[in-house]
A protein has these predicted regions:
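Well-ordered alpha-helical scaffold segments within catalytic/enzyme domains
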Residues: 99-101, 145-160, 175, 214-216
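Recognizes extended acidic, P/S/T-rich segments that occur
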Residues: 36-72, 82-88
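Extended, well-ordered alpha-helical scaffold segments
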Residues: 104-116, 160-177
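Pro/Thr/Ser/Gly-rich low-complexity, intrinsically disordered linker/stalk tracts
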Residues: 1-34, 69, 82-99
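Solvent-exposed loop and edge beta-strand segments that line ligand/cofactor-binding
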Residues: 128-144, 197-212
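Low-complexity, Ser/Thr/Pro/Gly-enriched N-terminal "stalk/linker" regions
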Residues: 97-139, 183-185, 189-190
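Extended ligand-binding groove/face enriched in aromatic
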Residues: 175-216
Length: 216
Protein backbone atom coordinates (compact mmCIF):
# COMPACT_ATOMS: atom_id res chain seq x y z
CA UNK A 1 0.00 0.00 0.00
CA UNK A 2 0.96 3.66 0.00
CA UNK A 3 3.58 4.93 2.44
CA UNK A 4 2.20 8.47 2.29
CA UNK A 5 0.10 9.68 5.22
CA UNK A 6 -1.09 13.07 3.94
CA UNK A 7 -2.55 14.41 0.73
CA UNK A 8 -3.18 18.09 1.10
CA UNK A 9 -4.97 18.37 4.42
CA UNK A 10 -6.43 14.87 4.28
CA UNK A 11 -4.94 12.21 6.54
CA UNK A 12 -4.78 8.93 4.67
CA UNK A 13 -4.02 5.28 5.54
CA UNK A 14 -0.64 3.77 4.71
CA UNK A 15 1.11 0.39 4.88
CA UNK A 16 -2.15 -1.24 3.79
CA UNK A 17 -2.25 -5.04 4.04
CA UNK A 18 -4.93 -7.66 3.50
CA UNK A 19 -5.33 -11.38 4.02
CA UNK A 20 -8.11 -13.48 2.56
CA UNK A 21 -9.79 -16.36 4.37
CA UNK A 22 -12.55 -18.73 3.22
CA UNK A 23 -15.36 -16.55 4.62
CA UNK A 24 -13.88 -13.10 5.25
CA UNK A 25 -11.10 -10.63 4.50
CA UNK A 26 -8.93 -9.02 7.16
CA UNK A 27 -7.75 -5.51 6.21
CA UNK A 28 -5.10 -3.64 8.21
CA UNK A 29 -3.32 -0.33 7.79
CA UNK A 30 -1.23 2.15 9.76
CA UNK A 31 -3.78 4.42 11.38
CA UNK A 32 -3.74 8.16 11.80
CA UNK A 33 -5.30 8.68 15.22
CA UNK A 34 -8.69 10.31 15.00
CA UNK A 35 -9.24 9.49 11.33
CA UNK A 36 -12.35 7.86 9.88
CA UNK A 37 -12.19 5.62 6.82
CA UNK A 38 -14.70 4.36 4.28
CA UNK A 39 -14.12 0.77 3.14
CA UNK A 40 -14.93 0.13 -0.52
CA UNK A 41 -14.95 -3.15 -2.43
CA UNK A 42 -15.27 -3.58 -6.17
CA UNK A 43 -17.85 -5.88 -7.71
CA UNK A 44 -17.52 -7.88 -10.94
CA UNK A 45 -18.18 -4.76 -13.01
CA UNK A 46 -15.23 -2.98 -11.41
CA UNK A 47 -17.41 -0.45 -9.61
CA UNK A 48 -16.66 0.25 -5.97
CA UNK A 49 -19.35 0.01 -3.31
CA UNK A 50 -19.15 1.23 0.29
CA UNK A 51 -19.18 -1.60 2.83
CA UNK A 52 -18.29 0.10 6.10
CA UNK A 53 -17.10 3.24 7.85
CA UNK A 54 -14.56 2.65 10.61
CA UNK A 55 -12.17 4.38 12.97
CA UNK A 56 -9.00 2.55 13.82
CA UNK A 57 -6.56 0.46 11.85
CA UNK A 58 -8.37 -2.70 10.77
CA UNK A 59 -11.60 -4.04 9.34
CA UNK A 60 -12.95 -7.55 8.80
CA UNK A 61 -15.27 -7.98 5.84
CA UNK A 62 -17.57 -10.93 6.53
CA UNK A 63 -19.95 -10.07 3.69
CA UNK A 64 -18.15 -12.17 1.06
CA UNK A 65 -19.63 -15.51 2.14
CA UNK A 66 -18.02 -18.84 1.26
CA UNK A 67 -17.50 -20.50 -2.11
CA UNK A 68 -16.13 -23.76 -3.48
CA UNK A 69 -13.87 -21.83 -5.87
CA UNK A 70 -11.19 -19.27 -5.07
CA UNK A 71 -11.97 -15.60 -5.77
CA UNK A 72 -10.33 -12.20 -5.64
CA UNK A 73 -11.52 -8.74 -4.65
CA UNK A 74 -10.14 -5.23 -4.75
CA UNK A 75 -10.51 -2.89 -1.77
CA UNK A 76 -9.94 0.81 -1.34
CA UNK A 77 -9.57 2.38 2.11
CA UNK A 78 -10.48 6.05 1.82
CA UNK A 79 -10.39 8.83 4.40
CA UNK A 80 -13.86 10.21 5.05
CA UNK A 81 -14.71 12.70 2.32
CA UNK A 82 -12.02 11.44 -0.07
CA UNK A 83 -13.45 10.40 -3.50
CA UNK A 84 -13.11 6.69 -4.15
CA UNK A 85 -12.41 7.26 -7.85
CA UNK A 86 -9.23 9.12 -6.88
CA UNK A 87 -8.11 6.57 -4.29
CA UNK A 88 -6.13 4.07 -6.35
CA UNK A 89 -3.11 4.78 -4.11
CA UNK A 90 -5.08 3.22 -1.22
CA UNK A 91 -6.06 0.09 -3.14
CA UNK A 92 -5.19 -3.50 -2.40
CA UNK A 93 -6.10 -6.75 -4.11
CA UNK A 94 -6.70 -9.89 -2.11
CA UNK A 95 -7.19 -13.55 -3.04
CA UNK A 96 -9.91 -15.53 -1.25
CA UNK A 97 -9.22 -19.26 -0.96
CA UNK A 98 -11.92 -21.83 -1.55
CA UNK A 99 -13.63 -23.08 1.60
CA UNK A 100 -11.67 -26.32 1.90
CA UNK A 101 -10.92 -28.14 5.14
CA UNK A 102 -7.29 -27.08 4.85
CA UNK A 103 -8.11 -23.38 4.37
CA UNK A 104 -10.56 -23.42 7.28
CA UNK A 105 -7.94 -25.07 9.51
CA UNK A 106 -5.42 -22.39 8.54
CA UNK A 107 -7.93 -19.70 9.47
CA UNK A 108 -8.71 -21.19 12.89
CA UNK A 109 -5.05 -21.70 13.73
CA UNK A 110 -4.00 -18.21 12.62
CA UNK A 111 -6.78 -16.53 14.57
CA UNK A 112 -6.10 -18.59 17.68
CA UNK A 113 -2.44 -17.61 17.44
CA UNK A 114 -3.25 -13.91 17.02
CA UNK A 115 -4.84 -13.77 20.47
CA UNK A 116 -1.62 -14.98 22.04
CA UNK A 117 0.73 -12.79 19.96
CA UNK A 118 -1.04 -9.53 19.12
CA UNK A 119 -2.92 -9.49 22.43
CA UNK A 120 -0.23 -10.89 24.73
CA UNK A 121 0.69 -8.62 27.63
CA UNK A 122 3.75 -6.72 26.34
CA UNK A 123 5.83 -6.99 29.53
CA UNK A 124 4.91 -10.44 30.84
CA UNK A 125 4.05 -12.30 27.62
CA UNK A 126 1.04 -13.85 29.39
CA UNK A 127 -2.41 -14.06 27.81
CA UNK A 128 -4.82 -11.34 28.84
CA UNK A 129 -8.04 -12.50 30.46
CA UNK A 130 -10.19 -10.47 28.06
CA UNK A 131 -10.17 -7.21 26.15
CA UNK A 132 -12.71 -5.32 28.26
CA UNK A 133 -11.72 -6.15 31.84
CA UNK A 134 -12.73 -3.28 34.12
CA UNK A 135 -10.07 -4.30 36.65
CA UNK A 136 -7.08 -3.36 34.51
CA UNK A 137 -4.59 -5.40 32.49
CA UNK A 138 -5.39 -8.79 34.02
CA UNK A 139 -3.52 -11.83 32.71
CA UNK A 140 -4.51 -15.46 33.12
CA UNK A 141 -2.32 -18.48 33.78
CA UNK A 142 -4.62 -21.16 32.36
CA UNK A 143 -5.12 -19.20 29.15
CA UNK A 144 -1.37 -18.75 28.93
CA UNK A 145 -0.98 -22.54 28.88
CA UNK A 146 -3.16 -22.66 25.76
CA UNK A 147 -1.12 -19.80 24.35
CA UNK A 148 2.18 -21.62 24.78
CA UNK A 149 0.82 -24.52 22.74
CA UNK A 150 -0.42 -22.12 20.07
CA UNK A 151 2.99 -20.43 19.83
CA UNK A 152 4.69 -23.76 19.19
CA UNK A 153 2.18 -24.69 16.48
CA UNK A 154 2.39 -21.21 14.94
CA UNK A 155 6.18 -21.37 14.72
CA UNK A 156 6.09 -24.89 13.31
CA UNK A 157 3.62 -23.85 10.61
CA UNK A 158 5.52 -20.69 9.74
CA UNK A 159 2.83 -18.24 10.88
CA UNK A 160 5.42 -16.62 13.14
CA UNK A 161 9.17 -17.08 13.38
CA UNK A 162 10.76 -19.22 16.05
CA UNK A 163 12.42 -16.08 17.36
CA UNK A 164 9.04 -14.39 17.81
CA UNK A 165 7.70 -17.41 19.68
CA UNK A 166 10.81 -17.59 21.85
CA UNK A 167 10.55 -13.91 22.73
CA UNK A 168 7.03 -14.32 24.15
CA UNK A 169 7.86 -17.61 25.86
CA UNK A 170 10.96 -16.07 27.43
CA UNK A 171 8.97 -13.19 28.90
CA UNK A 172 6.37 -15.64 30.20
CA UNK A 173 8.87 -17.95 31.90
CA UNK A 174 10.71 -15.00 33.48
CA UNK A 175 7.47 -13.67 34.94
CA UNK A 176 6.30 -17.07 36.19
CA UNK A 177 9.61 -17.68 37.95
CA UNK A 178 9.42 -14.47 39.96
CA UNK A 179 5.69 -13.93 40.60
CA UNK A 180 3.86 -14.86 43.80
CA UNK A 181 2.99 -18.54 44.13
CA UNK A 182 0.99 -20.58 46.65
CA UNK A 183 2.76 -23.76 47.79
CA UNK A 184 4.09 -24.04 44.24
CA UNK A 185 0.82 -23.24 42.49
CA UNK A 186 0.22 -20.07 40.53
CA UNK A 187 -2.71 -17.74 40.91
CA UNK A 188 -5.58 -17.79 38.45
CA UNK A 189 -4.99 -14.13 37.63
CA UNK A 190 -2.24 -11.55 37.96
CA UNK A 191 -2.16 -7.85 37.30
CA UNK A 192 0.09 -7.75 34.26
CA UNK A 193 1.35 -4.25 34.98
CA UNK A 194 2.21 -4.65 38.68
CA UNK A 195 2.81 -8.42 38.76
CA UNK A 196 0.63 -8.80 41.86
CA UNK A 197 -1.91 -11.56 42.35
CA UNK A 198 -5.47 -10.62 41.46
CA UNK A 199 -7.86 -12.62 43.66
CA UNK A 200 -11.41 -13.75 42.98
CA UNK A 201 -12.60 -11.93 46.09
CA UNK A 202 -11.43 -10.71 49.47
CA UNK A 203 -12.07 -14.19 50.85
CA UNK A 204 -9.38 -16.05 48.88
CA UNK A 205 -5.68 -15.60 48.20
CA UNK A 206 -5.91 -16.17 44.43
CA UNK A 207 -4.07 -19.49 44.20
CA UNK A 208 -5.63 -21.87 41.65
CA UNK A 209 -4.61 -25.49 41.17
CA UNK A 210 -6.83 -25.97 38.10
CA UNK A 211 -5.33 -23.02 36.23
CA UNK A 212 -1.87 -24.18 37.26
CA UNK A 213 -2.65 -27.55 35.64
CA UNK A 214 -3.74 -25.82 32.42
CA UNK A 215 -0.51 -23.84 32.46
CA UNK A 216 1.88 -26.74 32.95
Amino acid sequence: GSSTDTIGRVRVPYHIAAEGYPAHVHLKWADNVGSTYNIYRSDESGKFRTYAQVSGNEYMDFSIGTAEESRNYTYRICPEGFPVDSASAFEIKVDIPAATDSALLDMVQKYTLRYFTDFAHPQTGLARERSNDINGDIVTTGGTGFGLMSLIVGAERGFITREQALDIIGKTVAFLEDCEKFHGAWAHWYDGDSGRTFSFSKYDNGGDIVETAFLV
